[in-house]
Structure formats: structure tokens, C-alpha cells
Curated annotation (Swiss-Prot):
One of its GO terms (biological process) is DNA repair. The lineage of its organism: Archaea, Nanobdellota, Candidatus Nanoarchaeia, Nanoarchaeales, Nanoarchaeaceae. Keywords: Cytoplasm, DNA damage, DNA repair, Endonuclease, Hydrolase, Magnesium, Metal-binding, Nuclease. It is found in: Cytoplasm. This is Bifunctional methyltransferase-like/endonuclease.
Length: 299
């Protein structure tokens, strides 16, 4: 039942709308005379990391002006609406912070899926005939695949359209990008190693985009990202969850699924390029032609 849900793009697009509606509902629970913060709303959704999501969508609620930053400073427009309800001196609010939200905490549902998939992670020395780089762009809704043979010869490139409506929330990128990637890869007939523009085990719940795709489809995957999402670096080795999970080589290359650290080191020596591993560098160029730099982030 879980696997069929993970393949259903419409289900996850609806879930994304549910998140936005839940946020609106939470804001409308704030009584007159109270305010709340972005962080309190994120916690009510199930994870304080969702503050950026709250900041992106809170103005969809009729009483959005009751949501303030943690320093309680408000904008002139917000002040004009809020000063009829609470005390404001200068541009600072003096009012009780509402925290008693009634919420279904939808982000906890996503965490449970991530925790379930963690049990499917495998460490292996993969066998493959092709190496496929995968990147997603948003301007023209493109997923790009750069397909190489083992001799680093580019065999072909593919582009597919996607219809992603799930919002961007840090550490939940798999439910935004992983679902359409899984739907494309499940129909490919390649014995391949997949390099995905995102993270692997360097994720708070070991479930970066590369690990998500790898565990759902039981494929060998590697994550390759510009920035470190989670963990620490010592001597160019990336550590997360008290174990080495990858290497910093100007970008962050981490184990996704069915690979291991020794294999990763050998693969990087052969396939590293200027900005990314070669397959991602090619896929990234394809999506940039269509999207510019509008992608909000990479998990």
C-alpha cells in the first residue's frame, strides 16, 4: 500500500495542498488579542524546520497579520491591521503568543514514511553498465537524464515534463522531487548507477533525495549537492549519524543506497568534474537551459 502511494503524483500534489490548507486553518485558530510566530506554526505542522514554508504561504490566510517574526517586529501594513487588536509600541508587538493549536501535524506522517524507508537502506558494491545523472528544473518543469556508459561516453540525454505541486520544505524534498523521479526510473530498462542532484545519507533522518529514490526502487544511488544539508566535514570526509557517509570534493557526494564509502571514493576519482560529478554536471546544464536558477533548494 505504501509503495503504490509513493508512486501516485496526484496523491502527493493533494497532500501539498493539504499542508497549505492546514496552515491556513492554524492561523485562523489564533484568537483576537493574540499573535503567533512562524516557528510556532511550523511546530504545529509537525516540524520547526518548516518555518520557510510558513513564511511562503501564511498570507493566504485571512488573518495572516497575526503571524509575527520571533523578534515581534511588524511591517507598517501589518501594524495597521494588527494595532486594532493588540498593543504595539513603535513597530513592536506586545501581546501573548498563541501556542495551543489543534493540528493533525501532517509533517509527522512524512517523517514516518522516511523512517520506514531507512530500514531498506543497503550498503553494497554495485554492478552496473550505465551511469545516469538526474536533475530537476522548475522554469519549464523539466526532469533531465544524462546517460553515460562506463567509459564516460555520453550515450544520450532525455528530458521529461513533470507536474510538481508539492511545496518546498527543507528535509522533505523527496516528496516534491523524489516522486516524479521514481515514476520515471521505474520504467527505464537500464542496469545503471543513478547519480541524483541532492543528498543521500547526509540528512537528519538519513533520507535525502538519493536515498529516497534508491530505497523505493531498490536501486544503487549516489547524492551530489552544492551545499551540505546535514553533518560535519573532517579531512574532506562527510560524517553524519556518527558514521562517514561521503566526501567533500568542492561539492558534496554522499551514499544514497546500495553503494558504500570505498566504492564512492573510487567513483569520485574517475567521474569528478568541475562543479559536480560529470553525469550531474551534464544534467544540470540541460535543466538550466530551461529553468534559470529558480530551484529553491536541494535535500
Amino acid at each position: 500500500m505504501l509503495s503504490s502511494k509513493l508512486l501516485d503524483i496526484n496523491y502527493w500534489n493533494k497532500f501539498g495542498k493539504r499542508l497549505i490548507n492546514e496552515l491556513i486553518n492554524l492561523i485562523e485558530q489564533i484568537p483576537k488579542g493574540y499573535v503567533t510566530t512562524f516557528k510556532e506554526l511550523a511546530k504545529a505542522l509537525g516540524d520547526p524546520i518548516a518555518t520557510k514554508f510558513v513564511a511562503m504561504y501564511y498570507k493566504k490566510a485571512p488573518h495572516w497579520y497575526r503571524v509575527v517574526s520571533s523578534n515581534l517586529i511588524v511591517s507598517p501594513m501589518q501594524k495597521a491591521l494588527l494595532e486594532k487588536e493588540v498593543k504595539i509600541i513603535g513597530n513592536k508587538v506586545y501581546a501573548p503568543i498563541f501556542k495551543d493549536f489543534k493540528s493533525s501535524k501532517p509533517l509527522l506522517e512524512l517523517q514516518k514514511i522516511q523512517e520506514y524507508l531507512v530500514n531498506k537502506i543497503k550498503f553494497d558494491y554495485p554492478e552496473y553498465d550505465y551511469v545516469i545523472g538526474i536533475d530537476i528544473g522548475y522554469k519549464n518543469n523539466i526532469i533531465a537524464l544524462a546517460i553515460f556508459d562506463k567509459n564516460k561516453k555520453l550515450i544520450e540525454t532525455k528530458t521529461c515534463k513533470h507536474n510538481i505541486e508539492f511545496p518546498y520544505i527543507p528535509t522533505y524534498l523527496s516528496f516534491r522531487e523524489g516522486i516524479p523521479i521514481v515514476n520515471i526510473l521505474k520504467d527505464l530498462d537500464y542496469t545503471a548507477l543513478y547519480i541524483i542532484n541532492g543528498h543521500g545519507l547526509s540528512h537528519p533522518r538519513k533520507m535525502g533525495l538519493a536515498t529516497f529514490v534508491g530505497t523505493v526502487l531498490d536501486l544503487p544511488t549516489i547524492g551530489d549537492a552544492k551545499k551540505l544539508l546535514y553533518g560535519k566535514i573532517k579531512n574532506n570526509i562527510i560524517y553524519a549519524h556518527n558514521m562517514p557517509v561521503g566526501y567533500f570534493v568542492g561539492h558534496y557526494v554522499t551514499i544514497g543506497n546500495r553503494t558504500n564509502l570505498e566504492f564512492l571514493k573510487e567513483f569520485i576519482k574517475e567521474w569528478n568534474s568541475k562543479k559536480y560529478l560529470l553525469p550531474i554536471e551534464v544534467a544540470d546544464k540541460i535543466t538550466k537551459c530551461g529553468r534559470g536558477d529558480s530551484n529553491p533548494g536541494r535535500d
